[in-house]
């Protein structure tokens, strides 16, 4: 069951994402070779989405997996052209779970601020 905070977060995310590009303009961007919307990434970082799963010690908000699922759901619904799932969710989760304190300090603060974009690999 979602808490009141989760519901507010979901509504905030949905509202922001509904203001972004339409499917037609996303298709045009993809066909032109654009792989990411830099202005959107900056906005996501400023709103704290890039630090959703990152501890406050490293500049994140540590809102937990339910909040991360709500973000993923909204991003999927909006077809957002962004590396936020691979960087802010998958990579930061792995580093937070398995990284040393030095690795966390180096990578997580940079991910939370939006300065570093990581990706995840699931095979070779």
Predicted regions and their residues:
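Conserved "HGTGT" condensation-loop signature of ketosynthase/thiolase-family condensing enzymes
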Residues: 11
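Glycine-rich flavin
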Residues: 18, 22-124
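Intrinsic disorder at enzyme termini
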Residues: 1-5
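Conserved alpha-helical interface elements of two-component signaling phosphotransfer modules
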Residues: 8
């Amino acid at each position: 069951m979602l808490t009141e905070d989760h519901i507010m977060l979901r509504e905030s995310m949905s509202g922001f994402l509904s203001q972004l590009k339409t499917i037609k303009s996303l298709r045009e961007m993809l066909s032109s070779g654009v792989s990411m919307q830099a202005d959107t990434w900056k906005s996501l970082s400023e709103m704290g989405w890039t630090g959703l799963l990152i501890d406050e010690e490293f500049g994140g908000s540590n809102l937990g997996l339910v909040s991360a699922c709500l973000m993923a759901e909204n991003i999927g619904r909006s077809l957002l052209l962004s590396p936020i799932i691979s960087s802010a969710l998958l990579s930061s989760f792995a580093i937070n779970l398995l990284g040393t304190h030095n690795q966390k300090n180096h990578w997580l603060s940079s991910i939370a601020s939006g300065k570093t974009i990581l990706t995840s690999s699931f095979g070779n």
